[in-house]
Design a protein with these regions (language model features):
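Short active-site loop at a secondary-structure junction
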Residues: 23-43, 58-61, 96, 140
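Conserved catalytic neighborhood of penicillin-recognizing serine enzymes
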Residues: 54-122, 166, 178-211
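Short active-site loop/helix that positions an aromatic residue
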Residues: 47-49
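Glycine- and acidic
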Residues: 23-31, 107-109, 133-141, 189-191
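Mid-domain, small-residue-enriched loop/turn segments at the edges of structured enzyme/sensor domains
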Residues: 75-86, 117-155
């Protein structure tokens, strides 16, 4: 497993755990490229909120099958039908608020929302929020089909938690020479956090992340007990890649 802890307001990386035992694996899961699964849905919703003021967490979408024509993986010149399914294998048909669709990680709605807002806009938003890796402009991107690493994903989530202000991860805060003179100070030498989205977009994203823990059927409800132990607001998003190869919690 890999783990990153980062302060949203400062972008200071407080913990970086590449694996439970580096001597055995010698593989840094923080820097490795993996499919983020449903954790990528945050950028789909962010793009929708940012580019269409009529879309809010209470806007309703129906959980129903959607089929799209996409290039075949083996022969890009040939189109095939792609029909995404929910993790449970079926659609409920429910006309649900986006907040609930995000909390329950409904795949069909994420794909439809991605098509409505435009995949290119989703990519642009993801990059603005902190994703640096190349992203493929395909409908399946809404479900996290392009590889990213854990550090950039956490950094991008921190943008939402910092009210829409982005800053690259800070690993070193200060460097002194042997005489005690400051030769590097991150607060002076690194760019300050800059707004990359409207405040209301970040506010909506924060509400969505809380919904994953607080709404019935939310995918992060396993962390619910912590609400009673800490005087703070908690939220998050889970993600699982194909064949359960990777499991994420941000």
């Amino acid at each position: 497993c890999g783990f990153v802890a980062m302060e949203p307001q400062t972008s200071y990386v407080r913990a970086w755990v590449g694996d439970v035992d580096f001597n055995s694996w010698k593989y840094d899961k923080v820097a490795s490229m993996r499919q983020p699964g449903s954790t990528f849905k945050l950028f789909v919703y962010a793009s929708a909120f940012e580019n269409d003021d009529n879309i809010t967490p209470t806007t309703r979408y129906r959980d129903q099958l959607i089929s799209l024509q996409v290039p075949d993986a083996q022969d890009p010149q040939r189109l095939v039908t792609w029909t995404p399914h929910n993790s449970g294998g079926y659609c409920t048909g429910a006309n649900m608020p986006l907040k609930s669709a995000f909390a329950q990680s409904v795949n069909t709605i994420a794909v439809k929302l991605g098509q409505d807002t435009g995949i290119d806009n989703v990519i642009d938003m993801a990059h603005k929020m902190g994703i640096q890796s190349k992203l493929d402009a395909t409908p399946s991107l809404a479900l996290g089909s392009s590889d990213v690493n854990l550090l950039e994903l956490v950094d991008a989530y921190c943008t939402a938690m910092n009210d829409g202000k982005q800053r690259r991860p800070i690993l070193v805060t200060k460097i002194l020479d042997r005489n005690g003179n400051v030769i590097y100070d991150c607060e002076k030498d690194e760019p300050a956090p800059k707004p990359v989205m409207k405040y209301k977009t970040a506010f909506y994203l924060q509400r969505l992340l809380r919904a994953g823990m607080q709404e019935p059927g939310g995918t992060t409800q396993a962390l619910w007990e912590y609400i009673h132990f800490y005087d703070t607001e908690l939220g998050g998003k889970t993600g699982t890649s194909s064949n359960h190869s990777d499991a994420w919690v941000v």
